[in-house]
């Protein structure tokens, strides 16, 4: 699995992990938990309910919420595999992976974020260092914003 960005399949696995009672729904509390892990918990539960309009989301609604609200893209139910194409949305995604805020993504930061998202086993198996090397065009051992942006726009 390519770990260069959060894919729809990754989101499906996150949804399954969050759906602890396996009822096919993710509650607002579970949604707030994942937003907090991503560093995007800027809303109270009441505010989130106003945004979402209900107490829980099914898988399609969860995917749309992620792409519409988190990445500010125009994903739809039929075409949900959308990667944000504007600098602001890409910067927000970059900042999730740039854990220490130094302007660079290291293999360790990538691995840490994957683990925070509930992909502990996959993060150990994936070669995040190789992914960094593939997209590290200036060969400094990190992915900077421009390299990240080029990676996202050319996937």
Curated annotation (Swiss-Prot):
UniProt entry tagged with the keyword Transmembrane: no
CDD domains documented for this protein: EFh (cd00051)
Keywords from the named record: Calcium, Metal-binding, Repeat
Pfam families the record matches: EF-hand_1, EF-hand_7
Binding residues for Ca(2+) 2: 98, 100, 102, 104, 109
UniProt keyword Calcium present: yes
Domain of life the protein comes from: Eukaryota
Gene expressing this chain: CML44
Binding residue positions for Ca(2+) 1: 19, 21, 23, 30
Residues of the EF-hand domain: 6-41, 85-120, 130-155
Molecular function terms, GO-annotated: calcium ion binding
Residue ranges of coiled coil: none
Protein name (record): Probable calcium-binding protein CML44
Function: Potential calcium sensor.
GO biological process, one term: cellular response to hypoxia
